[in-house]
A protein has these predicted regions:
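Bacterial N-terminal signal peptides
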Residues: 12-22
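Short, isolated positions in well-ordered beta-strands
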Residues: 53-55, 139, 163, 281
Length: 302
């Protein structure tokens, strides 16, 4: 059985941006904060603490090969699932960081509409993107088919990420069976808000704030030392406490020496508390550090 074109595209994007991951925390807080790529299958249940996600695999299903490391565009291959016996269907669980997406979408519906527009002409997607509720959370749903395979992609927004479940099956009934299994999803915390309200605080997650809305809260910063290969980039997620102290640095991707340069610089940054509804709150934001090419060298005779 072949994988869906969407899965191949997603994996190829991940491979293209495959780099060493570095997770650096200020002080002794590394174990306190989960990261998206930390999900795993344990005793038949896929668990990802960053998204608060718990998904019990259908009976007879197992984890397939591990996917690529997170990419420079913030794409995560979280888990690939398959049946132990005949390969009648597959499921890919992935996530796209909204802060670093090549073409950021406003919401999960926009994400799937963009995907639909980008489908190969050999694929058929006559239905509009629909909406379903899975595990008490609103998801957008895209159905398409081609080459004798049925595809269903489900997406929702959590912590400024598109969380994606991609299903490929030989028969439509097998695909729908997997959708039914997703109705038993559980989320340990409520979804994080993307605006300044108390939803994220009630849910126990930091408030998700884009860089454009948080830049005024940077009180002091130190630029990273320009090092490593030309044209490199390091996307970073930061968690800043309600008191304005830097709590966690997650360098998503990057060349090792550039990741080291960025994290060492960030450890010296200072922030102002972020106020939401009159109260200082913990926030999560994203920054992209670019490493430009070295300036041209002058001839010794100039």
């Amino acid at each position: 059985m072949t994988v869906s074109r969407f899965q191949m595209l997603a994996r190829s994007l991940g491979v293209a941006g495959m780099v060493l991951i570095a997770c650096v925390a200020k002080g002794d807080v590394a174990a306190k904060y989960a990261e998206p790529e930390g999900g795993e299958v344990k005793n038949g249940v896929f668990e990802d603490d960053y998204f608060g996600l718990r998904y019990r695999l259908p009976s007879g299903w197992v984890e397939d090969l591990k996917g690529p490391e997170p990419s420079a565009s913030g794409y995560y291959s979280l888990a690939a699932l398959k049946p132990e016996g005949e390969l009648v269907a597959t499921m890919q669980i992935s996530a796209q960081d909204d802060f670093f997406a090549p073409e950021p979408a406003k919401d999960a519906t926009g994400f799937l509409n963009a995907m639909k527009k980008g489908l190969d002409t050999s694929l058929s997607a006559p239905k509009a993107v629909a909406h379903v509720k899975l595990g008490g959370i609103d998801f957008a749903r895209l159905d398409y088919s081609g080459a004798g395979l049925s595809h269903i992609v489900l997406a929702t927004e959590i912590r400024c990420h598109a969380l994606i479940f991609s299903i490929t099956a030989r028969r439509e009934a097998a695909a729908e069976m997997l959708v039914e299994s997703l109705r038993k999803l559980s989320f340990m915390q409520e979804r994080s808000a993307t605006s300044s309200n108390d939803t994220a605080v009630r849910g126990g997650w930091p408030l998700c704030v884009p860089e454009s809305s948080y830049s005024d809260h940077i009180a002091h910063k130190v630029d990273p030392v320009m090092t490593g290969p030309r044209y490199g980039s390091v996307p970073v997620r930061l968690i800043i406490g309600a008191d304005g102290k830097l709590e966690h640095i997650h360098a998503i991707a990057g060349f090792p020496e550039q990741v080291k340069s960025v994290t060492e610089a960030l450890a010296k940054w200072e922030f102002k508390p972020y106020i939401a509804n009159g109260q200082p709150v913990e926030v999560e934001t994203g920054l992209l550090f670019q490493f430009p090419s070295a300036p041209p060298q002058r001839n010794s005779g100039e």
